[in-house]
Amino acid sequence: YTNEKAALIVREMAELLMFRLTEKKLVTDSLTLEVGYDRENVDSGGYRGTTQTDRYGRTLPKAAHGTVRLEVPTNLGSQIVEQSVKLFRRITDPALTVRRINLTANRVQEDAGVEQVDLFHDTQKQEKEKRLQQTMLDIRNRFGKNALLKASSYEEGATMRQRNGQIGGHKA
């Protein structure tokens, strides 16, 4: 994938992560992103950076890896998506094509519903977003995962529709 298509996939993965956290009533305060690059970057001869060898003995550009801490434990899609894309932009080399992306929620805990009130966050807006996420989740559960998608899921290079039709990463 090109860097822009990979950023779109990271956005979709973050949205899926948000749905999973919301469904299980969990929150996270840390996200980890790992991006593996395609070997064609080295094979073409243009790459001069740090390399690593995969389990097949092929030379690849060294994978990008990063973690971001969220201000407070959350399952709000706006925060998870924003921080995931920012992390992607910070750790990746835009000149390289991407082969593999892993997004992980760390330090996952039950959503106790207790939040520290401060002057910098609009709690009414956050509650509205939580209700919207739950409504979206209810629609997806009732009518299927592809019943409610963002317009970006129809862009070229988006994988959400195909991913929703898979079970364990395989065609259903």
Residue ranges and their predicted role:
Residues 1-172:
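Basic, low-complexity intrinsically disordered segments
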